[in-house]
Design a protein with these regions (language model features):
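Bacterial N-terminal signal peptides
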Residues: 5-16
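N-terminal secretory signal peptides that target proteins for export/translocation
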Residues: 1-2
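Conserved, structured core segments of small domains
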Residues: 21-157
């Protein structure tokens, strides 16, 4: 019995380096693109920090008319400016009405930086919407959304 135990122990010790090598090989991603990861600001898990901004109905909604149209034109221009600067990963409206109007996923690490960007948006300046800020840790691949989105619509942004 001792001999069987000793043989099993020796075999398991001999197999340990092989198992470790297999585990390391399995942990290496054959699709990993170091240059892309660096470009997108990815950490070792392929993730990065963002701030999720939820835009809610504000205290001063503007009535339909030229002032409201101009405000929203400025809002969309601000979205494009943030995307062009690489500061906006995702933006869009919530469907179905209600208090929640839209969202931004800003590619900044702190709420303070997000607040500084959002406070330049006409819908926030005018009080049409107010913003809630939530730190978010998500895939760095979100940074590709603006690049891909431009290729999906035949209309200019």
């Amino acid at each position: 019995m001792f001999r069987s135990l000793a043989i099993c122990t020796l075999l398991s010790l001999a197999a340990a380096p092989l198992q470790a090598a297999e585990a390391q090989a399995a942990a290496t991603n054959p699709h990993f693109d170091a240059a892309l990861a660096q470009q997108l600001g990815a950490d070792a898990q392929g993730m990065r920090r963002y701030v999720l901004v939820v835009l809610k109905t504000g205290p001063k909604p503007l009535p339909k008319g030229p002032a409201r149209d101009a405000m929203f034109k400025g809002h969309f221009a601000n979205i494009n400016k943030l995307a062009d600067a690489g500061q906006l990963a995702v933006a869009g409206p919530f469907m179905g009405g209600g208090e929640w109007r839209g969202l931004f996923v800003l590619a900044v690490p702190t709420v303070e930086e997000a607040r500084a960007l959002v406070e330049t948006d006409p819908v926030v300046i005018e009080g049409e919407m107010v913003a809630e800020y939530h730190p978010l840790y998500s895939s760095a691949a979100l940074m590709q959304v603006p690049v891909l989105h431009r290729r999906l619509s035949p209309q200019a942004p």
